[in-house]
């Protein structure tokens, strides 16, 4: 249920930015569809203060950087609009939004109104039950993924550096990692939040962990982009999470992903861990039960009876086999629960990132005054 609530908050984030097709913020002459132009115009309104780009929000920073590289003015609405249009196509694809349609569900006014008839507050969202395209949600999730991709800058020997300007976003990622320490352990047992405060760089091992966390969060953003566009086959904007980045869930549930750094697995150690997990499962919930001591059973005088009262080799083999099976079942169940918790946590962080995408210092101050 928590995961569903997190996903719902991601889908409704776009409703914070209602879109009107009649917007005349600019006469953008790009090849974008009418619907995408309407989204861009609405985002420009949210990103500007008194006709000037607010560079204090995550998206504002990224757009300002792109505009500076192109020699564009942050004081021109036309330049801001054209640059945002270009940025969207660079990050989401050349043909993104080229044939976006208007949702048919909901009220009679605006774009895909949520049954209100006013066309305000629903953004570009269409009938959620039909899974039709929600262009605003696609844009926000795609740009949110792009912000994550730009957080780390490669440096020497596999390490990376980051900017203090991106600290609000970095701290959300670090908190996600601290909340899921089993998947993202630190070498010294400290916190990722403190790691960010030490300096503005990560070594190769820290970078690998951080990128793994970014991949998990990015996958949530990509999944939401795919859901908004009606794509249900996975993929989307999120980087596919490789087995090497998340590790083997059957092993990680007990040992953590660090164990996957060793290519040569100690089979004996693994079997021992599975047996130990099987014993824990049995002791907590019955199952195989306590090994039977033959000394408490009648021998019946048969040759097959074990006169020493010890468990026979055959019984011991069956017992170990049963423990291994129970250990594997319990480990896989734990891994499934861990994976669900991780994805739920990632969905929450993704929703926070989308909600903060346009939140700059200036409009936060204005909202507080209002």
UniProtKB/Swiss-Prot annotation:
Entry's family note: Belongs to the harpin HrpZ family.
UniProt comment concerning the protein's domains: The glycine-rich region is characteristic of harpins.
Cellular component aspect of the GO annotation: extracellular region; host cell plasma membrane; membrane
Coiled-coil regions listed in the entry: none
Predominant subcellular localization, coarse grouping: secreted
Protein origin, superkingdom: Bacteria
Residue numbers spanned by region 2 X 7 AA repeats of G-G-G-L-G-[ST]-P: 235-291
Protein name per its UniProtKB record: Harpin HrpZ
Record region (Disordered): 221-257, 282-314
A Pfam family recorded for this sequence: Harpin
Protein species of origin: Pseudomonas syringae pv. tomato (strain ATCC BAA-871 / DC3000)
Subunit structure: Homomultimeric.
Sequence repeat segments: 235-240, 286-291
Function: Harpins are proteins able to elicit hypersensitive response (HR) in non-host plants and are required for pathogenicity in host plants. HrpZ forms ion-conducting pores permeable for cations. Such pore-forming activity may allow nutrient release and/or delivery of virulence factors during bacterial colonization of host plants.
Gene that produces this protein: hrpZ
Any GO BP: monoatomic ion transmembrane transport
């Amino acid at each position: 249920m928590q995961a569903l609530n997190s996903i719902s908050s991601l889908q409704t984030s776009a409703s914070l930015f209602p879109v009107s097709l009649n917007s005349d913020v600019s006469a953008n002459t790009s090849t974008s569809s009418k619907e995408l132009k309407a989204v861009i115009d609405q985002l420009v309104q949210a990103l500007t203060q008194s006709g000037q780009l607010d560079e204090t929000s995550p998206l504002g920073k990224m757009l300002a950087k792109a505009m500076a590289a192109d020699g564009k003015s942050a004081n021109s609405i036309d330049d801001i609009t054209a640059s945002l249009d270009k940025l969207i196509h660079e990050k989401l694809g050349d043909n993104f939004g080229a044939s976006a349609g208007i949702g048919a569900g909901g009220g009679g006014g605006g774009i895909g109104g949520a049954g209100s008839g006013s066309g305000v507050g629903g953004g570009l969202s269409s009938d959620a039950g039909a899974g039709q395209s929600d262009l605003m949600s696609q844009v926000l999730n795609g740009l949110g993924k792009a912000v994550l991709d730009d957080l780390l800058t490669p440096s020497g020997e596999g390490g990376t550096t980051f900017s203090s300007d991106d600290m609000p976003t970095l701290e959300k990622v670090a908190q996600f990692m601290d909340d899921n320490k089993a998947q993202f352990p630190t070498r010294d047992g400290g916190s990722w939040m403190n790691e960010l405060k030490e300096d503005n760089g990560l070594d190769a091992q820290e970078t690998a962990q951080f990128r793994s966390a970014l991949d998990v969060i990015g996958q949530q953003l990509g999944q939401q982009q795919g859901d908004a566009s009606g794509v249900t086959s996975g993929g989307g904007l999120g980087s596919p999470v490789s087995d090497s980045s998340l590790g083997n869930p059957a092993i990680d549930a007990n040992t953590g992903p660090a164990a996957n750094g060793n290519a040569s697995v100690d089979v004996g150690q693994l079997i021992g861990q599975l047996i130990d997990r099987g014993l824990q499962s049995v002791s907590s919930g019955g199952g195989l039960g306590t090994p039977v001591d033959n000394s408490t059973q009648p021998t019946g005088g048969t040759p097959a009876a074990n006169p020493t009262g010890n468990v026979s080799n055959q019984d011991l083999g069956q017992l170990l086999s049963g423990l291994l099976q129970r250990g594997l079942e319990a480990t896989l169940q734990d891994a499934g629960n861990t994976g669900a918790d991780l994805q739920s946590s990632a969905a929450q962080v993704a929703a926070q990132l989308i909600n903060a995408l346009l939140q700059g210092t200036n409009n936060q101050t204005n909202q507080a005054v209002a």
